[in-house]
Amino acid sequence: MLNIYDMVFLSPIGTIGISIINDKVHELKFINNLKESKSKDSFHKDLSRQLDLYFKKKLNVFDVPYDLRGTQYQINVLKKVAKIKYGSTQSYSDIAIKADSHARPVGNACRNNPIQLLIPCHRVVGKNNIGGFSGENVKKNGNMMFIKKSLLEIEG
């Protein structure tokens, strides 16, 4: 499926595609091969400013409205993930206990997170390793794992 992004932000660790509907972030994902777009209005400019500050280690809480989508279970899990503080991590099992669930479904909810960074699934790790990111398994060690490691390092 081809996504059309309202805004593209070039971060130091990867390109971010952002969809905005009714002044709420609808999707924010690391995507390869997108060209930067200029901020269109005050909402776009503020989001761009916050992203820039985050990557400069000068912002640790985003203050932009977003539209959290998914199944009721996914939304429940992602709301718990949203509470993980900057610089902290929790295991899939930790989140599962809070959601009265199991680690694997928590991982699936994180894999389908439509708004990376704002809902910080990169802060959810395995008990014995860093865990996956955006559907990429830790063993693959590809682009998404580079992004997860980089985000955790930024927040270090």
Predicted feature descriptions by range:
Residues N3, M7, F62-G156:
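Nucleic acid-binding interface residues in structured DNA/RNA-binding domains
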